[in-house]
């Protein structure tokens, strides 16, 4: 585990209500910065915890997809209403079993390019977990 980070920034909206927002400060090819910490690898965001995505269980599918996909054998952060998979520039494959499991669990699964995935996390931080691909 890379450590527990305060991923939510509180601010007042126009009506004087408190809202939470995730603090993604920078991302580029090969890295992402969240709350001042730069990660040079894919990350998993699970209820406020940021950790390295452990791809090893999915590497056996690499030849089939030409890229290490997200497979059901990884530690996927299922405890959420929405799971966002940031596909980098669109290159990260998501295996059918992951899609089926999300449907079985009644979790909204969004597979989006990294920029759109980050925007989605900012809009719904309290009910969304994520896997973010940063290396392509």
Regions found by a protein language model. Name each.
Residues 18-59:
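N-terminal, charge-rich interaction modules
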Residues 117-136:
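Short basic, glycine-rich beta-strand/loop surfaces that mediate nucleic-acid
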Residues 4-21:
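Short, Lys/Arg-enriched N-terminal segments with co-localized hydrophobic residues
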Residues 39, 75-80, 123-126:
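Flexible, charged surface loops at secondary-structure boundaries
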Residues 52-77:
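Compact, glycine-rich, soluble single-domain proteins
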Residues 46, 86, 131-135:
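Short beta-strand segments
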Residues 76-111:
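Mid-chain, well-packed structural core segment of small domains
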């Amino acid at each position: 585990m890379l450590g527990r980070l305060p991923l939510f920034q509180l601010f007042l909206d126009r009506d004087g209500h408190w809202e939470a927002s995730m603090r993604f400060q920078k991302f580029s090819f090969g890295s992402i910065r969240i709350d001042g910490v730069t990660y040079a690898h894919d990350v998993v965001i699970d209820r406020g915890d940021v950790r390295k995505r452990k791809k090893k269980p999915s590497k056996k599918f690499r030849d089939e997809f030409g890229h290490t996909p997200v497979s059901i054998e990884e530690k996927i952060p299922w405890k959420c209403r929405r799971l966002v998979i940031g596909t980098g520039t669109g290159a990260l494959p998501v295996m059918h079993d992951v899609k089926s499991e999300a449907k079985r669990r009644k979790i909204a699964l969004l597979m989006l390019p990294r920029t759109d995935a980050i925007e989605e996390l900012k809009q719904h931080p309290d009910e969304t977990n994520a896997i973010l691909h940063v290396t392509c």
